[in-house]
Structure formats: structure tokens, C-alpha cells
């Protein structure tokens, strides 16, 4: 699995925000935490989607680079090719979406946190189904859950730039349900879970679309009251990892 940091973040920060080593040791998976290159403001970033933060021809081809990271891991390690994933936070979550658009041939699933796909759902259509777990706080002021103006300005992208408009989490989910031909909204057996360690009780509602024919799932974990930075603990991280491992190619 790739684990991708957000804008201004780096691999060390991401590893502290969502540590995976103990789960990797327990469950026997490998993960890569690459670093994005620096932009003109000296902040690390990913050239992801038109919302955050790309795609731009004058920036590095991060999609190609991350595919090379995956291919390199396959050559060096014993990898279950049916269980290759991408996970990211914020700009890294958008980059996970970009990877699913571009590399649906190899990715089984993605788990973007507070990320977003292309604003125009017809800009790029993935060739193969990819399971999607989108996680988003309803109180996110940086990447608004319901869409609208983007609170962050990155290399000239700002709320005054139409390309910076945020696609709402539910609209984004429905786009991927359409890509995957997940026409059936299914009532999950477990409707709510506890995700954010600072919120009381079962703070997260699950919305799920299924395609029983190709066994593809598109799911939204809507964390009520959480901001841009969901506060994780060992158990909530385990829920995300278990979801990914339960959704092979």
C-alpha cells in the first residue's frame, strides 16, 4: 500500500499521523510512504487532481512515479497482486484518487481521507473497477464535506479559480459508484462506527454502494463533527486497514 501525505506534509508527518508499522507486522503487509516534491513555495505536494493540486504539465508526473514505486515493490518483495492499495490524506487523498483513475489495472482499492477526485467526472474514466473507501469529516473547513470553495490556495489555485472548487463527498462517491456500475445503494449491516478518538460514541455513518456482479464496493465514512484532521487511534486505524484487506481485486 502507498500512504501519501497532504500538502505541506511529508512522509515523517504522515507516518506519525497514521502509523501502520504495528498493523503491518501483525497482518503481514508492506507499505511505502513516499515524499512529494517541493513546489514554488517550498512545500511538498502531489500533482493530483484539478481540485488539489493539479494535474499540471509543468509539475512532476507523480502518477507515473508512484506507479514505479508500486512496480519496484512488486519486484523486490512477495506481493499479493490482488491486494495493492493506495491511501492518502488531503492532497494525498486526491493523489490516491488520481492513482485509481490512472492505474485501475493494478489497484484493488483506495482509501482517501479528506481527498477528492476530478471535478468533471468525464475527464478521466477508469478502465477497471476499483473499490473506494472515502473518509471525510463533516466539519472539514479545508476540504468542505458538502463541496464549495476550497479553503487552501496552492500555487495559484484558490476559491477564485473555478478549478479550485471542491466536489462534495457524496457527489464524489456517486461518481465512483457510476464508474464501478455500483447502481445499488445498500444498507450496511453496521450503519455507524466510532472513528475519531476525540468524539463521543459512534461518530461515523456508513454509506455504501454495491455492484454484486463484479463484487465492487464504493463506501463513504461520514464522520460527524470531525474536522480536516480526523483524530485516529489504534482501533480506528485497524478498521481502515481491515476494510482494504477485505476488498481484493
What are these regions, as identified by a protein language model?
Residues 1-85, 95-98, 102, 146, ...:
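Serine-hydrolase catalytic machinery in alpha/beta-hydrolase-like enzymes
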Residues 74-130, 141:
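Primarily recognizes the serine-hydrolase "nucleophile elbow" in alpha/beta-hydrolase
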Residues 134-136, 140:
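Short beta-strand/loop motif that positions the catalytic acidic residue
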Residues 140-143, 227-230:
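Acidic catalytic loop of the alpha/beta-hydrolase fold
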Residues 143-164:
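A solvent-exposed, charged loop/short amphipathic helix patch at secondary-structure junctions
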Residues 160-200:
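Acidic, glycine-rich loop-and-strand cores that form catalytic or ligand-binding grooves
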Residues 235-249:
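Catalytic active-site module of serine/aspartate enzymes centered on a nucleophile-bearing elbow/loop
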Amino acid at each position: 500500500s502507498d500512504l501519501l501525505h497532504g500538502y505541506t506534509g511529508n512522509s515523517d508527518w504522515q507516518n506519525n499521523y497514521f502509523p501502520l508499522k504495528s498493523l503491518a507486522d501483525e497482518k503481514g503487509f508492506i507499505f511505502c510512504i513516499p515524499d512529494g516534491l517541493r513546489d514554488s513555495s517550498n512545500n511538498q505536494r502531489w500533482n493530483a487532481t484539478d481540485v488539489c493540486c493539479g494535474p499540471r504539465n509543468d509539475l512532476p508526473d507523480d502518477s507515473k512515479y508512484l506507479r514505479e514505486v508500486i512496480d519496484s515493490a512488486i519486484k523486490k518483495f512477495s506481493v499479493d497482486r490482488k491486494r495493492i492499495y493506495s491511501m492518502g490524506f488531503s492532497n494525498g487523498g486526491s493523489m490516491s484518487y488520481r492513482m485509481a483513475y490512472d492505474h485501475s489495472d493494478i489497484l484493488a482499492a483506495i482509501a482517501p481521507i479528506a481527498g477528492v477526485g476530478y471535478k468533471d467526472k468525464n475527464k478521466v474514466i477508469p478502465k477497471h473497477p476499483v473499490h473506494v473507501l472515502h473518509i471525510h469529516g463533516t466539519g472539514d473547513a479545508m476540504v468542505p464535506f458538502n463541496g464549495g470553495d476550497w479553503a487552501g490556495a496552492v500555487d495559484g489555485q484558490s476559491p477564485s479559480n473555478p478549478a479550485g472548487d471542491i466536489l462534495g463527498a457524496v457527489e464524489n462517491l456517486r461518481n465512483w459508484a457510476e464508474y464501478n456500475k455500483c447502481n445499488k445503494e445498500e444498507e450496511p449491516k453496521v450503519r455507524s462506527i466510532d472513528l475519531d478518538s476525540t468524539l463521543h460514541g459512534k461518530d461515523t455513518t456508513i454509506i455504501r454502494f454495491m455492484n454484486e456482479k463484479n463484487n465492487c464496493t464504493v463506501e463513504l465514512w461520514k464522520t460527524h463533527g470531525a474536522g480536516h484532521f480526523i483524530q485516529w487511534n489504534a482501533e480506528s486505524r485497524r478498521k481502515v486497514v481491515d476494510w482494504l484487506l477485505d476488498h481484493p481485486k
